Structures are given as structure tokens and as C-alpha cells.
Amino acid sequence: MTEPLETELYLSSEKDELFEKGPWPKPFAFNAEVVKVFDNMVCRSVPLYREVVAGAVHWTRAYYQPKTRIIDIGCSTGTFLELLGRFLKQPAILVGIDNSSDMLDKAKEKLAQVEQIHQIELICESAENCSFEKSSVVVMNYTLQFLSLPQRQKLLRAIYQGLVPGGLLFISEKIRSDCPQFQETITHHYEAFKAKNGYAQNEIERKKEALENVLIPLSEAEQLQMLKQSGFSYIESLIKLHNFVSFVAFKSD
């Protein structure tokens, strides 16, 4: 019988009003002001965010191999690692990578209790400069989309090479449709989702403008192709709503 997972996330309660009151970052960057409200921002901006984090924990537990590492690329404030640390019974090496020192400061606070059970390593570095050797699970949620296309393929290949046989990549990304009419409808529903979560239209427009040429989404087919070209033998889409999707990719040998 599958053990139930407590999915109550450890999140900061500070409300995201960054694009209402300003000064808002343009172009968008994960600076100290964004970090303060990041937990609230991501929950109100990413559909099914809690389900994605919980799903990543379930898949990590299923594919984790003892004496290997679990790596979270773009770990931000440590929400996934904190939930995983509560759920994973055996001591493990949990690695969080982020190029924002402010994010890692928040993650360190959030992981204080988890650190009593697991070995925690927080690395302030760009993912493309990191090693993924001896990892059985790599999680990368909403991170690859901020890199250039050549960097994305290079990073995915490095992850594949670093994973042990039987290892897993859990990856979530914002995507776009190849069909202009579909994309228009998706955008309409996504902005309605954000409005329902309390964002005013001017906030939505300001953030969209700040993210222009910073977050560059690919189509779902392009995402799958990049994963295949990196060497992954089996790939499945798990969670999808509006213009966000999560995949699992398996390394068989």
C-alpha cells in the first residue's frame, strides 16, 4: 500500500506585491526583493505548483538509490528539498543548486530541521558549472527555461551523464503552443488563473514585460526532443495545465 504523503509545503507567508507597488525588476531577476516574496509568487503564478512539488517527492522516493545524491537544480528557497527531507525515511545526500545567494539563505533556514536527518549541500553556482556525478535523481522545476538554447542542451546532457543507471530526471517547464490560436486561448486562461489568485491586470502585464527575452519557452515537442537527444530512453509527461508541464525522463544504462 502506498504511504500517504503530507503535502503541506513550508512556504513564506509574505505576499507578492512586487509588480503592484514596485520597484519591479526589469528585466526580471531573482534579486533580494523577488526572493522575499518568491514562495507566494510561485504558488499564485504556477498552476498545480503544490501537486508538482509533491509529485517530484513521490518520484524521487521511487527512484532514489542509497549512497547516491539527490540534486535539485534551481532549488530556490528549498521547498522541494524540505518536503522530501520530511518524507524520505533513510538519511540521504540532498543537494540544492541555485545561482542566487539570497535564495540559498532562505533555503538554509527552511532546511534547518531536515539537516538533522540528511546531509544537506547548498551550492551557489550556475547549474552548467556543476557536476551531477553519482546522482540517482535530479529535479529541475522551472529552471531550464531561463537558459539559452545551447546551454539547455548542454546541461541536459551533463545531467544524463551524471545520473547512475536507473536514474531519473524530474523536470517542469513553461511551454508554448505551435498553434497561434491555441496559444492565445492558453494565455487567456492562464491570465485568468493569475487574476483569480489576486493579481491585477497591471501586475500581470508588468511581469510579462519583465520576463520578455528572459524566460523563453519551447513547445512540448521541442522539450521532448531535447530530452531524447540528451540520451534519455523513456520520457513521460505527468502533469500539465495551461502552459506548464512536468516530465520524467529515465536513464536505462
UniProtKB/Swiss-Prot annotation:
<feature type="binding site">
    <location>
        <begin position="98"/>
        <end position="99"/>
    </location>
    <ligand>
        <name>S-adenosyl-L-methionine</name>
    </ligand>
</feature>
<protein>
    <recommendedName>
        <fullName>Carboxy-S-adenosyl-L-methionine synthase</fullName>
        <ecNumber>2.1.3.-</ecNumber>
    </recommendedName>
</protein>
<feature type="binding site">
    <location>
        <begin position="74"/>
        <end position="76"/>
    </location>
    <ligand>
        <name>S-adenosyl-L-methionine</name>
    </ligand>
</feature>
<dbReference type="InterPro" id="IPR029063">
    <property type="entry name" value="SAM-dependent_MTases_sf"/>
</dbReference>
<comment type="similarity">
    <text>Belongs to the class I-like SAM-binding methyltransferase superfamily. Cx-SAM synthase family.</text>
</comment>
<dbReference type="GO" id="GO:1904047">
    <property type="term" value="F:S-adenosyl-L-methionine binding"/>
</dbReference>
<feature type="binding site">
    <location>
        <position position="49"/>
    </location>
    <ligand>
        <name>S-adenosyl-L-methionine</name>
    </ligand>
</feature>
<dbReference type="Pfam" id="PF13649">
    <property type="entry name" value="Methyltransf_25"/>
</dbReference>
<comment type="function">
    <text>Catalyzes the conversion of S-adenosyl-L-methionine (SAM) to carboxy-S-adenosyl-L-methionine (Cx-SAM).</text>
</comment>
<dbReference type="InterPro" id="IPR005271">
    <property type="entry name" value="CmoA"/>
</dbReference>
<feature type="binding site">
    <location>
        <position position="141"/>
    </location>
    <ligand>
        <name>S-adenosyl-L-methionine</name>
    </ligand>
</feature>
<keyword id="KW-0808">Transferase</keyword>
<dbReference type="GO" id="GO:0016743">
    <property type="term" value="F:carboxyl- or carbamoyltransferase activity"/>
</dbReference>
<keyword id="KW-0949">S-adenosyl-L-methionine</keyword>
<dbReference type="InterPro" id="IPR041698">
    <property type="entry name" value="Methyltransf_25"/>
</dbReference>
<dbReference type="GO" id="GO:0002098">
    <property type="term" value="P:tRNA wobble uridine modification"/>
</dbReference>
